Amino acid sequence: MRYITSGESHGKQLTTIIEGLPSQLPITAEDINASLRRRQGGHGRGKRMQIEKDTVDIVSGVRHGYTLGSPLSLVIRNDDFKHWTDIMGEEPMEDPSKMRRVVTKPRPGHADLNGALKYGHRDMRNVLERSSARETAARVAAGAVAKKLLKELGIEVSGYVKEIAGIEASDLPELNAQERADKANQSPVMVLDATVEEQMTNAIDQAKKEGDSIGGVCEVYVEGMPAGVGSYVHYDRKLDSRLAGSVVSINAFKGVEFGIGFEAAKRNGSEVHDEIAWDETHGYYRTTNRLGGFEGGMTTGMPIIVRGVMKPIPTLMKRPLTSVDIETKEPFKATVERSDACAVPAASVVMEHVVAFELAKALTEQFSSDQLPQLKKAIDDYREEIRCF
């Protein structure tokens, strides 16, 4: 199971193609649209969210509400394209000298300069249009399908904000995945701990007022994954490694940790590892979950807890950073595209869906998965097998 996306930020549309989905998975456009609406929410979003009202068209791979087993194609139209038809059109220009909104000034912290060097673009709009976080809408669409598959398999995934601008939300370990999702969806900053909401919104408002930006930490919590998914045999089959790669592939994410994460460096081994226990009902389990649901690159059967750190968005309104024009080689203060003061709440939704897809991919690789009933039976049989091991 895999997916690819295509499309530019101000182009006609974003497209997602998912290959390897089992047949007979119930799915509707609304299942995906609900996730797209969540991605567009959260305090601190910019004006682009007032323009785009993301909805998906399912153009192949589904018939009468069920997947066929063939590639699933999803399209999200860019409403803003009507204002960019001349700039982003696919046909050659009769007079290239009349090209508008040419970008020759790379913005620090963005892909502009590196992408121009790699692909030879003198107009860096060719870079920033694809490297834009607008593409994450297509990734959320893919993840929404994966979440529907995981739910059919008894696995729940929830994402939320853990920290913004150094303001940290308290842990609420008593909450299950659905309760976490409900709380996050009721919060303007998608946080579980309501006592820090006002502090976080004030920090976002202050950053916006000052023309600056702030980052934070997102957390994803997964319940219901059976033990032994992933592998210790080869480095590239370790599931925690694959999850880490998928998280830092999200725009502006610069770090990832599982369980207690980097805190482990400050503790003795006796305070890090999770002791093993067994009972007749559950089989093997851990008495703690400091390692976040992973040992040896495989799931332990405990909840997966993964966090990702998002840097502040580099587009600064009133405090632009210095760069160099690639045509004149003269220094300048970075130009501004529409941007958010804080996109951490929305990023928690993106991270949730990226993690969901990687987990669904791992399950369809490990278990027979041409048909959903076949996949369900294979996983149920495996759960019973390891319970009695």
Swiss-Prot record:
Pfam families per UniProt: Chorismate_synt
UniProt catalytic activity: 5-O-(1-carboxyvinyl)-3-phosphoshikimate = chorismate + phosphate
One Gene Ontology term, aspect cellular component: cytosol
InterPro entries membership: Chorismate_synth, Chorismate_synth_AroC_sf, Chorismate_synthase_CS
PANTHER family registered for this protein in UniProt: CHORISMATE SYNTHASE
HAMAP family for this protein: Chorismate_synth (MF_00300)
The protein's name in its UniProt record: Chorismate synthase
Gene: aroC
